[in-house]
Amino acid sequence: RRQRQMCIRDSPTGETFTHAELVTFLDAIPSNVLVTLDEAYYHYNRTEDFPRSLELLSSYPNLVVLRTFSKAYGLAGFRVGYFVGSEEACSNLSKTVIPFSTSLAAQAAARAALTIRDQLLARTDAIVAERERVTKELRAMGFQVDNSQANFVWLPRSDAQQLIDYLIQRKVIIRGFPGEGIRVTIATPEENTQFLNVIADYPAIRPEI
């Protein structure tokens, strides 16, 4: 059976698409093609027209939604997640899962994480607030910053390697894509401020588009 995979938030840019765009895409896919929708950054989306994927499962039995405990839940070391869909679609997807890939400890951690929704919301709200602050300050400096709905921001730069080297020399570690840009993970307010103070002194601060 054929499969198509989509990411709700593009990595490394963090940009997303609307509910209507998702429906248009699903309508264009044959019903015998399995569609897996990666929602790893689902909890960081604050757009009003974000894709409401779970509402579509009854209308699109070939759709499976994938989510992880590695991002918002903070369980990256456990490598645990889940998927939701029709019985047939989940059965087909299960055939690709490596046997015994999740430990008992990871399962216990995931179950416990599901019981602390208030803490999850507080944590993600804090990251979103910092994401908006970092984005605003970078743009005020003159950097181009894409509209991210994830826990990171993307700065497109033709001089990415030069900027990567500049930051590393000042002990600031980011994810670099030479010739394309840099992806900066939103951390604590103190760490974000340190990053902003360092990048503010970057000699070629004006973006090269």
Spans of model-derived segments:
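Hydrophobic residues in well-ordered beta-strands that form the structural core
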Residues: 37, 65, 102, 174-176
